């Protein structure tokens, strides 16, 4: 009888260990489906690329390329003119 019990326990041990490893594989949070992730990323990239091309071709963007290009020092000159204009104006007396 003891031999039969040892034999049955010997048969059950691999089955228990196999089911335990299957449960560990299911609980593994770092198992990713890379093929689906790659396809999803490519679809997302194609959609963004298509939207960009449609925006460029639709001419709804109010980018005006006909503006006269400014000289690099124009903005600095405007700020300096405002500062000097405010400094030279007489200040009004407060009542």
Curated annotation (Swiss-Prot):
Instruction: Specify the species.
Output: Bos taurus
Could you state one GO cellular component term attached to this entry?
A: glutamatergic synapse
One family from Pfam that matches here is ATP1G1_PLM_MAT8
The beginning of the lineage is:
Eukaryota, Metazoa, Chordata, Craniata, Vertebrata
Q: Does the keyword DNA-binding apply?
A: no
Q: How does it assemble?
A: Regulatory subunit of the sodium/potassium-transporting ATPase which is composed of a catalytic alpha subunit, a non-catalytic beta subunit and an additional regulatory subunit. The regulatory subunit, a member of the FXYD protein family, modulates the enzymatic activity in a tissue- and isoform-specific way by changing affinities of the Na+/K+-ATPase toward Na(+), K(+) or ATP.
Q: Which residues lie on this side of the membrane: Cytoplasmic?
A: 59-95
Q: Identify its membrane topology class.
A: Single-pass type I membrane protein
Q: Spell out where the chain crosses the membrane.
A: 36-58
Name the predominant localization: membrane
- Family that this chain belongs to: Belongs to the FXYD family.
Q: Segment Disordered: which positions?
A: 69-95
Q: Could you say which residues form the signal peptide?
A: 1-18
Protein's recorded name = FXYD domain-containing ion transport regulator 6
What is the role of the protein in this entry?
Associates with and regulates the activity of the sodium/potassium-transporting ATPase (NKA) which catalyzes the hydrolysis of ATP coupled with the exchange of Na(+) and K(+) ions across the plasma membrane. Reduces the apparent affinity for intracellular Na(+) with no change in the apparent affinity for extracellular K(+). In addition to modulating NKA kinetics, may also function as a regulator of NKA localization to the plasma membrane.
Q: Which InterPro entries match?
A: FXYD_motif, Ion-transport_regulator_FXYD
Q: Name one GO molecular function term.
A: sodium channel regulator activity
Annotated GO biological processes are: positive regulation of sodium ion export across plasma membrane; potassium ion transport; sodium ion transport
Q: Where in the cell is it found?
A: Cell membrane
Alphabetic keyword roster: Cell membrane, Ion transport, Membrane, Potassium, Potassium transport, Signal, Sodium, Sodium transport, Sodium/potassium transport, Transmembrane, Transmembrane helix, Transport
Q: Which residues lie on this side of the membrane: Extracellular?
A: 19-35
